Amino acid sequence: GPRWHNNKLWFSDFYQHSVMTLDLSGKIEKIVEIPNQPSGLGWLPNGDLLIVSMLDRKIMKYSNNELSLHSDLSKLTPFRCNDMVVDKDGDAYVGNFGSLHHARDVKPTCLIHVDPQGNAKVAAKKLDFPNGTVITPDGKKMIIGETYAGRLTSFDIGLDKRLSNRKVWAKMMPTWYYIGVRFALATIYKLLNLQVKEGSITPFPVPDGICLDEGNGVWVASPTTSEVIRFEEGGVITDRLATPDRAYACMLGGHDGKTLFVITGKSSIPEEAQSEKNGKIYTTLVKFARAGYP
């Protein structure tokens, strides 16, 4: 989950188990080590850093160079936790994989809400791998990527932080494919105990990390098609930029908020990612500046 904060890009390196920063001169700095793999990042109003710890399903808090537990999510989901968005009040929404073996055993799963004090509860159910998430500047709408469903889904956010009025915001995967072919292929892979390679089940774009801009567009990193795509509500595509490797996440930042940072790698399969160490961060200038959260 890359984030632009204090004039630096903050990002999680899963397999070096570290939260890192990158400044505009190209300098990389290690901030803190998270033994059980860091993922989504966000900040409380007082400036404390929240970090999703994937494997043990916790949110850790980094404050004054010390790491402590903010919230334990392990009783709410059996699956690895992943991306997170934190709003201006310090309320966090955290997604999870919805499967133990990627696309082989997909199950609808939940989105978890964590209040600023660390109290956690289920905010929404029956999501297909809730992943990258954004909140509009007024704090009233959430847009979340459902990776396995190939769509962006929106919710209204109430004053009590409850989610309602669920809608499909943009569809990337045809309904016929989502309902039939994808699950048939996943079943075959599971029965034959085959390793699912990225892109082998879904030839369409899917949302991994996402970010919001001032033109009410959402930039989507799509690992299956190795690109970043800008969508507007209804599924209209305004921009499409190919990446040399698989695109896993994106964030707008820079001095004017118009630099699009794109996190890429050749694979997210742990053994391959750890041995090859080929992750890269690309940048490009875009028309609209960053908006909302994160």
List each language-model region with its residue ranges:
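Residue position within the beta-strands of beta-propeller blades
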Residues: 11-12, 51-52, 92-96, 143-145, ...
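Blade-level signature of beta-propeller repeat domains, shared across WD40, Kelch, NHL, RCC1
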Residues: 251-294
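Beta-propeller fold detector
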Residues: 29-33, 68-72, 121-125, 163-173, ...
